[in-house]
Amino acid sequence: MSHRKFSAPRHGHLGFLPHKRSHRHRGKVKTWPRDDPSQPVHLTAFLGYKAGMTHTLREVHRPGLKISKREEVEAVTIVETPPLVVVGVVGYVATPRGLRSFKTIFAEHLSDECRRRFYKDWHKSKKKAFTKACKRWRDADGKKQLQKDFAAMKKYCKVIRVIVHTQMKLLPFRQKKAHIMEVQLNGGTVAEKVAWAQARLEKQVPVHSVFSQNEIIDVIAVTKGRGIKGVTSRWHTKKLPRKTHKGLRKVACIGAWHPARVGCSIARAGQKGYHHRTELNKKIYRIGRGLHMEDGKVVKNNASTSYDVTDKSITPLGGFPHYGEVNNDFVMLKGCIAGTKKRVITLRKSLLVHHSRQALENIELKFIDTTSKFGHGRFQTAQEKRAFMGPQKKHLEKEKPETSGDL
């Protein structure tokens, strides 16, 4: 007669408690990479939006492995990353209790999608945010005070961060409210950082100026929400035997009689998903350029490779499910990342210095799949589908000449 195994290690990690809904929607950077003054001034993080997944084919270049010189199919995630707009500078001074904000300077002009973030109901508001801050840039006394503030930053501050926001008008979303974030500047002296930030106020910063191909980065995001779940789904506890009274997907014992309370380490039902998570060491397989004009023509071959020279875009046939088309710059990351489609993703430079062969391997893609993600896709491009299917009714109706209505 069979019975369940009573002794087993605990299920679930206690380091992520409490398992409750995150109070922030955008991933927060809690630790920044160590500053290196010998390098040029650069941003250490970027914001993007998860579009979807596809797969690639490449040849492995890691001598000594059995799979070296062999082709490998890998899943990748596409994160759309339109240029960020720099709208402010923040200086921090070092105190015995840590960093303290010293000065915050905003740009003269802030777009409506940025100012919307400071209102709960933009339509009913008076829309007067930053009107006083902007006046400082227009009169002589205000300009003198701004120069004094920038000089004080160079003299007293130890850490310089810039305030950036995303451009929602470039994305296929209904949302108009931009996401705003402070991003730390690393490299160079404090004076060079302040000058870098001052020169880029109200200007766009593209993703290829922050990251590069083959770089290892960290991904910070809020996971996909699953709602209220039981212990078997939430903690992966073992199901009880079939004849158990009052249910199988439960915990048989929730603790001893005394202490007369349920311990915090006992698996219980509750919220699953929508947790703030940081995933380390994601490799960038490609930084693609969005649709752009060259010699009067629209260039959209950001999914072509040296082996597959087909003129095709990274957007699959029919668009990414629940997202749409990717028309801006994008970052292709190996594997999956946290969050659902359209979720804002924080990309941060790695905190570690990588020396492994896998991290230093040069990635050369042979093929990027662009078939439809709504089913079992067969065609890579719309032209390939039309050549195989032949003329369809909708194409014949377009080519049919218009008949006059006069008899």
UniProtKB/Swiss-Prot annotation:
Residues 394-407 have a biased composition (Basic and acidic residues). Residues 1-35, 383-407 are annotated as: Disordered. InterPro entries: L3_arc_euk, Ribosomal_L3_dom_3_arc_sf, Ribosomal_uL3, Ribosomal_uL3_CS, Transl_B-barrel_sf. One of its GO terms (biological process) is translation. Component of the large ribosomal subunit in striated muscle cells. Residues 1-31 have a biased composition (Basic residues). It comes from Bos taurus (Bovine). The keyword Iron does not apply. GO terms for molecular function: RNA binding; structural constituent of ribosome. Belongs to the universal ribosomal protein uL3 family. Keywords: Ribonucleoprotein, Ribosomal protein. GO terms for cellular component: cytosolic large ribosomal subunit. This is Large ribosomal subunit protein uL3-like. Heart- and skeletal muscle-specific component of the ribosome, which regulates muscle function. Component of the large ribosomal subunit in striated muscle cells: replaces the RPL3 paralog in the ribosome in these cells. The ribosome is a large ribonucleoprotein complex responsible for the synthesis of proteins in the cell. Inhibits myotube growth and muscle function. It holds the Pfam family Ribosomal_L3.
